[in-house]
């Protein structure tokens, strides 16, 4: 499979539905800093109330997410003074570490960060120290490979959601650290 410009691979609903049912973000808006066509925010809007607010940040004007969209390079934006309740992102693979690092740096005390990553992203000499400093609170493995091409075909990679939670609370206790979702096509 040839790489797409800006690593744009839309996230299928099956890859995110179980995650959104599990998460219980504090009240506030949901932000996807690599929104593409808005698939993750569409799924969040279907699971949560529209009054929350949904912000799509997208570098490529060819993609038109059906939400409030800020056309900008997330990695060069200054931090928001009002962090979201939930950062949810399928970042470009080549920039995944940079996206996650920035989301973690910009989260508020109650913000949840969820990034869809290749499972192989966990194993890397390059990221060894980074993972020790930024280990997620939970990993959700997608048992079925999702199709990011819209034709049902999958690549040969396994995928996971890496999740960092805000402060634990009665409404949002820390869940199991490792679990499996069906998640595929």
How would you label these PLM feature ranges?
Residues 1-185:
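Class I S-adenosyl-L-methionine-dependent methyltransferase catalytic core
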């Amino acid at each position: 499979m040839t790489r797409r410009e800006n690593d744009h691979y839309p996230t299928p609903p099956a890859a995110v539905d179980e995650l959104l049912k599990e998460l219980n973000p504090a009240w506030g808006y949901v932000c996807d800093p690599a929104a593409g066509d808005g698939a993750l925010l569409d799924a969040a809007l279907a699971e949560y109330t529209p009054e929350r607010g949904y912000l799509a940040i997208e570098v490529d004007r060819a993609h038109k997410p059906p939400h409030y969209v800020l056309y900008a390079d997330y990695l060069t934006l200054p931090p928001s003074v009002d962090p979201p309740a939930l950062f949810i992102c399928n970042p470009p693979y080549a920039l995944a570490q940079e996206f996650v690092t920035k989301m973690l740096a910009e989260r508020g005390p109650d913000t949840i960060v969820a990034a869809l990553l290749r499972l192989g992203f966990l194993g890397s000499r390059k990221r060894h120290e980074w993972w020790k400093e930024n280990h997620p609170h939970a990993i959700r493995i997608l048992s079925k490979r999702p199709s990011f091409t819209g034709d049902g075909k999958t690549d040969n990679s396994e995928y996971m959601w890496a999740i960092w939670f805000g402060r634990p609370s009665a409404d949002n206790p820390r869940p199991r650290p490792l679990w499996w979702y069906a998640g595929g096509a």
